[in-house]
UniProtKB/Swiss-Prot annotation:
Transmembrane segments: none
Keywords: Amidation, Disulfide bond, Ion channel impairing toxin, Knottin, Neurotoxin, Potassium channel impairing toxin, Secreted, Signal, Toxin, Voltage-gated potassium channel impairing toxin, Voltage-gated sodium channel impairing toxin
Organism, as annotated: Chilobrachys guangxiensis (Chinese earth tiger tarantula)
Organism placement in taxonomy: Eukaryota, Metazoa, Ecdysozoa, Arthropoda, Chelicerata
Protein name: U18-theraphotoxin-Cg1a
Predominant subcellular localization, coarse grouping: secreted
Length: 86
C-alpha cells in the first residue's frame, strides 16, 4: 500500500510541475506576441502597394494586384486572371 501511495504522490507532483512549466511557457508566448504583431504591422504599413482596389471598386486592371484583373461585369472587384509567377 505504501509504495502505491508514494507512486501516486510522485505522479501528482510531476503533473503539477509540468503543468506549471506549460503555463510559464504559454505566458512567455503571450507576452511576446503583442510585440510581434506590432512589428509586423510596421512592416505592412511601410510597404507601398500598387494594388488599391482588391476588395471592390476597381475600374481597370492596373488597380489590382499582380495576377488579378478587374471584372468587366458587376460586381466590380479584382479576380484572378489565370496567370502564375512573380
Amino acid at each position: 500500500k505504501a509504495s502505491v501511495l508514494i507512486t501516486l504522490a510522485v505522479l501528482g507532483v510531476m503533473f503539477v510541475w509540468t503543468s506549471a512549466a506549460e503555463l510559464e511557457e504559454r505566458g512567455s508566448d503571450q507576452r511576446d506576441s503583442p510585440a510581434l504583431i506590432k512589428s509586423m504591422a510596421k512592416v505592412f504599413q511601410s510597404e507601398e502597394r500598387e494594388c488599391t482596389k482588391l476588395l471592390g471598386g476597381c475600374t481597370k486592371d492596373s488597380e489590382c494586384c499582380p495576377h488579378l484583373g478587374c471584372r468587366k461585369k458587376w460586381p466590380y472587384h479584382c479576380g484572378w486572371d489565370g496567370t502564375f509567377g512573380k
